[in-house]
Amino acid sequence: MSLIDQAREQMAKTVENTKENFSGIRTGRANPALLNGITVDYYGAPTPIKAVASIGVPEPRTLSVTPFDASQAGAVEKALRNSDLGVSPNRDGNVIRLTMPELTEERRKEYVKLAKGKAEDGKVAVRNIRRKTKEALDKAVKDGEMGEDEGDRLLKDLDKVTKSVTDEIDALLESKQKEIMEV
């Protein structure tokens, strides 16, 4: 596998990571990914909520959480109540409902700022991958493993890949901003 292919693969993982980070940012709509960071004290062991309960979206602004083990409904409710989501869980038997409140303009702007920060983190990671790959290319040229023309051509390819990936991150950010600001 060439250096450029390795860089492309690492950058693709960075884009996926950025998408995952974006999915955890609240918008006006309910999204099961909002609960990804929440852990439940499941028989004494911290366990991700999606491993102990099914999460559904019955209405655009409501999440329903149904524990697989009915005896753990209290622990799941407690984990949701102690989370930083800013919503109060309503328990109805074994089903726990979370109603997402409308976001204020101020909160929307905070979330846009957060999204911009996560996008910038992704771009920094891409630039670091580019830098490391360029260093490896320069070393290969210096050590005589490839000619200067080959090194220059690969560097241009690397720059094209880097540009396309940063453009993709920008497009993801723009899409997320629209989603957040949508009332």
UniProtKB/Swiss-Prot annotation:
One of its GO terms (biological process) is translational termination. It comes from the Bacteria. It holds the Pfam family RRF. Disulfide bonds: none annotated. The keyword Ion transport does not apply. The keyword 4Fe-4S does not apply. It is found in: Cytoplasm. One of its GO terms (molecular function) is ribosomal large subunit binding. One of its GO terms (cellular component) is cytoplasm. HAMAP family: RRF. Responsible for the release of ribosomes from messenger RNA at the termination of protein biosynthesis. May increase the efficiency of translation by recycling ribosomes from one round of translation to another. This is Ribosome-recycling factor.
